[in-house]
Amino acid sequence: MQKEVKKSWALFLGIGTMMIAHGLQMQIMGIRSVLEDFSVVTIGIFMSGYYVGYFIGSKTTPNLVQKVGHIRVFAAFASLASLSALVAVAYVNPFMWTISRFITGISLVSCYVVSESWLNDRATN
């Protein structure tokens, strides 16, 4: 058991870092949207883009993992998540933020699904 955990430390570190960064991003986007005087409805719409992406990503990721493998899917979606965070910083626009949140939802759930299936593949029992 300890041998398997030692082999997977990079995966745990990567997922932990992404969870911390995402938690900060969610808080900062909410605060920034109020400072930019977005309406409450607009804030609700672009913040819900994350959950729409989360739902779609959970349905599409297993097929991608079967086609190209765990490491490639994880790397691609981790990169996409960081790109969407940069887009949100570069463009202060509710439409772009909705797209950014949607991509973040797809990316993070994909990384979570990949890490879980990766650990299940490594499990011996």
Regions found by a protein language model. Give the residues of each.
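Helix-to-loop junctions at the C-terminal end of transmembrane segments
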Residues: 57-69
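Helix-breaking motifs and short loop linkers at transmembrane-helix boundaries and internal kinks
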Residues: 37, 69, 90-96
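Helix-loop boundary and gating motifs at the non-cytosolic
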Residues: 4-51
